[in-house]
Design a protein with these regions (language model features):
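C-terminal secondary-structure termini that scaffold catalytic or DNA-interacting sites
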Residues: 137, 148-152, 156-164, 169-175, ...
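Basic/aromatic-enriched alpha-helical hairpins
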Residues: 1-27, 43-46
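Hydrophobic (often cysteine-bearing) scaffold residues that line and stabilize catalytic clefts
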Residues: 13, 32-39, 77, 96-97, ...
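C-terminal catalytic core of tyrosine-transesterase DNA break-rejoin enzymes
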Residues: 31, 49, 102, 106-113, ...
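Active-site/catalytic core of tyrosine-dependent DNA strand-transfer enzymes
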Residues: 77-82, 126, 145-194, 200, ...
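Basic, Lys/Arg- and aromatic-enriched nucleic-acid-binding interface segment
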Residues: 26-39, 49, 53-117, 125, ...
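Short, polar N-cap/turn motifs at the start of nucleic acid-interacting alpha helices
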Residues: 55, 121-128, 193-195, 214-236, ...
């Protein structure tokens, strides 16, 4: 922002900053405005905290601009699940990438949570995947009940990644997990570019479960969506675990009982 860069920080006003950013709004770059105003406010907050200025005149500057529209992740309709599983069965992609996509679909986890999954997080005896808070978007630990199908996927990949820290280790960088974009790139190669992204697998699961009238609170708990009420959130995590186990098993059965259910068998044979 050259027009502001030469000004002493105590001379920067909201009106002139808005004027500088208006061309971005006119160009439709609303996400960029959001990022820029956040960065500017971090600087101004630092200046207040260090005594350089008394107040931050730009604190509410984002209200002067149109908010960026929320982008929904590309996903499929439930009726398209059989075709997806068939395409996945015969896709020309690596075995670990194929299972990575299936694991995310079965567990309803986020791409980053799946890509970084560690063997130490898996409790085979309790049939649970315990994801620590630092790996979760909302920085809260999340436990996912594992269906028989997900346990079977673990046995499929164990010979290929059992010696690694990660379920899905990178084949390019030793000691690291696969890129969070690996699944997206594979879906594009499968012909789903512009129709489905890895994060959209969660929406596919959510839509299917809601259509079959599962408890919405149980679905939200499975998706690790935030409940602003801390007590209610803690209660739900404990109370819904067994209900989620039943639901996750139903979801896995739905995935593998589609007319094109050769996916796991194909992986085992190849």
């Amino acid at each position: 922002l050259p027009k502001l860069g030469k000004l002493p920080i105590h001379q920067i006003k909201a009106s002139q900053t808005i004027e500088v950013l208006k061309p971005l709004e006119e160009a439709g770059k609303l996400d960029m405005i959001k990022r820029v105003t956040q960065a500017i406010n971090q600087i101004m907050t630092f200046a207040v905290n260090t005594g350089i200025i008394n107040t931050n005149p730009l604190a509410n500057i984002t209200k002067a601009f149109e908010s960026p529209k929320k982008r929904h992740q590309l996903t499929l309709e439930p009726k398209e699940l059989p075709a997806l599983m068939k395409a996945l069965s015969y896709a020309n992609i690596q075995l670990l990438t194929r299972v990575m996509i299936e694991w995310q679909l079965h567990t309803m986890s986020r791409p980053s949570e799946t890509a970084g999954a560690r063997w130490e997080e898996i409790d085979l005896e309790a049939r649970l995947w315990n994801i620590p808070a630092e790996r979760m978007k909302m920085k809260r630990p999340h436990t996912i009940p594992l269906s028989p199908q997900t346990l079977e996927l673990l046995e499929i990949i164990r010979p290929h990644s059992g010696e690694s820290e990660f379920l899905f280790p990178s084949d390019m960088k030793k000691g690291q997990h696969r890129n969070t974009q690996t699944a997206n790139m594979a879906l594009k190669r499968m012909g789903y570019g512009g129709r489905l992204v890895a994060h959209g697998l969660r929406a596919l699961a959510s839509t299917t479960l809601n259509e079959h009238e599962f408890n919405p609170d149980v679905i939200e708990a499975a998706l690790a969506h935030t409940d602003k009420n801390e007590i209610r959130a803690a209660y739900n995590r404990a109370q819904y675990l067994e209900k989620r186990r039943v639901m996750m098993c139903w979801w896995s059965n739905t995935i593998t009982s589609t007319p094109n259910k050769e996916n796991v068998a194909f992986i085992q044979e190849n």
